Amino acid sequence: VPNKNELEKMANLLIEGMESGCLGLSTGLVYEPGRYSVSNEIIELAKKIQKYDGVYVSHMRNEAEGLIESIIETANIGLEANVKVEISHLKSVGKSNWGKSEQALDLIEKFSDDGLDINMDQYPYTARSTMLKALLLNDTFNYENDLSPMGKSMPNEVLLCSVPNEKSFEGKTLEDIQKLYDLPIIETVNKLLDDVSDKILVAAFGMNENDVQNIMKNDLTMIGTDGIDVGSKPHPRAWGTYPRILEEYVDRLGILTLENAINKMTHMLLRNLE
């Protein structure tokens, strides 16, 4: 937690950014170093973007068993700072959390109905794209309990997308590497990070298609992605998000009309960043 002087320096940097044309404040509360931030710290910073009509965008603290609490935290930051809120990549991760999308959407809609300018974005896949190190630090591979801010994924559900220094591992699953190393899963991941690279990108399955569709249909949901197109087997959201929406969810499944899909991919995004 920053002291008063450190928080003031952070605020000044934020103001400098807003004066230079930035659109708001973004946090990644499952990643280093954002995972150590507390709500009061973020509220004080978010207050600095209010006069610029900035937006607070958050990759929330917990997208699994703590999903509801994280939505409340995110919304309260917006309320306390009097700023717009966007939830990044709304999802409910881990089989024990499948079905929570309905409760999550009801809660977000209530905040919206009560006057908070809040919405969310989503990518149309059941696998997330992230750093292997982040999954390890968030207890994804500790199967003794359901506690993990990023949800649980089994070794066969984690695909290695980019492996610096060992391209032959790209396209393999953690289960493949675990068999190669003949080690328990956590030791396998640690060996990969220590001996090969600590910058391994993965695609980790863990969401349910019904939740994806429920979130997609909501009037507050925008479609977008920040996927990283590196490695020989990158997560397809880096280039396939919009084609997948049109082919799978408009043409094949009819989850969205063409007009609604285009609105979610264009006008809604622009309106949120005005």
What are these language model-derived features?
Residues 32-36, 63-67, 93-97, 126-131, ...:
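Flexible loop/turn segments at secondary-structure boundaries
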Residues 187-193, 258-266:
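Short, well-structured alpha-helical segments that form the helix of a local strand-helix-strand
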Residues 47-55, 76-86, 110-117, 252-258:
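Secondary-structure transition/capping motifs at alpha-helix termini
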Residues 200-212, 253-263, 270-274:
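Acidic, glycine-enriched loop/beta-strand segments at the rims
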Residues 1-80:
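Hydrophobic, small-residue-rich alpha-helical packing segments that form membrane-like cores
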Residues 21, 59, 121, 182, ...:
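Divalent metal-coordination and catalytic microenvironments
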Residues 227, 235, 246-262:
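Generic long, charged, amphipathic alpha-helical segments
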Residues 1-3, 81-83, 91-227:
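Polyanionic/metal-chelating signatures
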